[in-house]
Curated annotation (Swiss-Prot):
PANTHER family for this protein: ARGININE--TRNA LIGASE, CYTOPLASMIC (PTHR11956:SF5), ARGINYL-TRNA SYNTHETASE (PTHR11956)
Principal EC category: ligase
Protein name: Arginine--tRNA ligase
Enzyme Commission designation: 6.1.1.19
SUPFAM superfamilies tied to this protein: Anticodon-binding domain of a subclass of class I aminoacyl-tRNA synthetases, Arginyl-tRNA synthetase (ArgRS), N-terminal 'additional' domain, Nucleotidylyl transferase
Length: 550
């Protein structure tokens, strides 16, 4: 019996009790919540449903809790139901009911924990979207990990997710990039507003390999040659790095296409139709302050050139016209102003601002030997995705970046995350999976297979804790998806790994020496099989490997 099953039982029981006592059944909340008490001595689960209902239906909370508890004790799978405090209901499950989660996990396999919670949604998930002027830096790497994990997480809940990279190939930064390449190719100093670093020299040399006469071309043609080839080379490197990191995209949208295909003009025309565009001081303005932004925004500047927001407007409209009912943007710490701006853009088009969600990620700091590792893209000392992977590996890099809420700055201790110790969270979780895999191999050598026919034998305290944690997985995924918080998967896996290690230390799974195998051994093997499956499922959502051996 999962927490969701128990919640449904509690709701149906409470409904029957209210009816029996001629009380208002409509007072019941849409969802009845059961929680695991902090003190296991209070039971397996607890609910405050009686406290929620009492005032609404005019009943004494303890008396109402008593009625519900008495009815619950007659239900299949409930070992006891007791009233505590002002009206809490503490519940204990029968072992056989609790252990049914093992069957559910084994039957569902890699699909365990999936639901149709978001089946009605077509989601555009835009993340990373770094300028093609340099390698992916550590901040962008955080989004590469978190964004990919969020996409996987939403997919487990039935959402149709498209991962999209907005390719910023329009604007002044691309011109500065091209000028930096030209200076490097000529052996000249980097322009004051340019990009520096060995990667600039490398790309400049590769441009000359592809276009040996580039430096002898007229200035405009030379600039365009370095711009076009340089951007293509840089972005190829970005995509390759992301792929090796385990992050791939379904769609790459070029910012330049928003301008070259007339999408910006179409967006402005659409806004004129809604009356949310006006002219002032020779410029074209969006009435964004009417929709929650702190001020109106210039869309077309007085010189006739589109402002940056023009591309954003066209891009949002493009997404909506492609059928996305939810557009999630994952942006850096310096983009807080974009939350109101993008929601205002949606409202200006006559769309629901709720179709736009903006997640803001905080800074990532690397620490080596207790000292921060500095980064500066323009100074050429940028810490890149490739650097992080080289230092601690793909799995540790992804896990370390996903593990904390995105609105929290994080420090990544390179020594910790590269260590083979229980203090390293990803090692701790992966070791649990490897340990379970070794156990399965050893069982096979003994001719033992998991057996779910006698799960009622799983009555040890540590077995009960492990079963309840396994049962939490589907609900945790729903919560993590609803809140857009994949870090919850990491924290759950660490709890599950800890519960498994403690179970393993207390409960012998395989017979020793000449000991005859028993039904308890094979029931514990089934519990281990289920635990291994859930760990693999969770790591899969994170894009982290589940090793068979370590």
């Amino acid at each position: 019996m999962t927490p969701a099953d128990l919640a449904e039982l509690l709701k149906s029981t409470a409904t029957a009790v209210l009816s029996e006592h001629a009380l208002d059944t409509s007072a019941l909340p849409q969802t009845v919540v059961v929680e695991r008490p902090r003190n296991p001595e209070h039971g397996d689960y607890a609910s405050n449903v009686a406290l929620q209902l009492a005032k609404k239906v005019g009943a004494n909370p303890r008396e109402l809790a008593g009625w519900i508890a008495e009815a619950l004790t007659k239900a299949d799978g409930i070992a006891s139901a007791e009233v505590a405090g002002p009206g809490f209901i503490n519940l204990r499950l029968e072992t056989s009911a609790q252990a049914k989660i093992v069957n559910a996990i084994i039957d569902a396999g890699s699909g365990f924990g999936h639901s149709e919670l978001m089946a009605a949604h077509k989601v555009n998930l835009e993340f990373v979207s770094a300028n093609p002027t340099g390698p992916i830096h550590i901040g962008g790497t955080r989004w590469a990990a978190v964004g990919d994990a969020l996409g996987r997480l939403l997919s487990t809940q039935g959402a149709d997710v498209v991962r999209e990279y907005y390719f910023n190939d329009h604007g002044a930064q691309i011109d500065r990039f091209a000028n930096s390449l030209i200076a490097a190719a000529k052996g000249e100093p980097t322009p004051d507003d340019g990009y520096a670093g060995t990667y600039i020299n490398d790309i400049a040399a590769r441009v000359l390999q592809k276009a040996p006469d580039a430096l002898s071309l007229p200035d405009a043609q030379m600039h365009e040659t370095f711009r076009e080839i340089g951007v293509d080379l840089m972005f190829s490197h970005i995509k390759e790095s992301l792929h090796e990191f385990g992050t791939d995209f379904d769609v790459y949208t070029h910012e330049d296409s928003m301008h070259s295909t007339g999408r910006v003009d179409q967006a402005v025309a659409r806004l004129r139709e809604t009356g949310n565009i006006y002219e002032k001081d020779g410029a074209t303005w969006l009435r964004s302050s009417s929709f929650g932004d702190d001020k109106d925004r210039v869309v077309i500047k007085s010189d006739g050139k589109p402002a940056y927001i023009a591309g954003d407007l066209a891009y949002y409209l493009d997404k909506r016209e492609r059928g996305f009912d939810l557009c999630i943007y994952m942006l850096g710490a310096d983009h807080h102003g974009y939350i109101a701006r993008l929601k205002a853009a949606a409202a200006a088009f006559g769309e629901d601002p709720a179709t736009v969600e903006v997640l803001i990620g905080q800074m990532v700091n690397l620490v080596r030997d207790g000292q921060p590792v500095r980064m500066s893209k323009r100074a050429g000392t940028v810490i890149t995705l490739d650097d992080l992977v080289e230092a601690i590996g793909v799995d540790a890099a992804r896990y370390s970046l996903i593990r904390s809420s995105v609105d929290t700055p994080i420090d990544i201790d390179l020594a910790l995350w590269s260590s083979a110790s229980n203090e390293n969270p990803v090692y701790y979780v992966q070791y649990a999976h490897a340990r379970l895999s070794a156990l399965a191999r050893n069982a096979a050598e003994l001719g033992l297979i998991p057996d779910t026919d006698h799960l009622e034998l799983l009555s040890h305290e540590k077995e009960g804790v492990l079963l309840r944690t396994l049962g939490d997985f589907p609900r945790m995924l729903k919560t993590a998806a609803s809140l857009r918080e994949p870090h919850r998967v990491c924290r759950y896996l660490e709890d599950l790994a800890g519960d498994y290690h403690r179970f393993y230390d207390s409960c012998r799974v395989l017979p020793q020496g000449d000991e005859e195998p028993t039904q308890l051994h094979t029931a514990r093997l089934a519990l281990c099989q289920a635990t291994r499956q859930v760990i693999a499922n969770g790591l899969g959502i994170l894009g982290v490997t589940a090793p068979e051996r370590m």
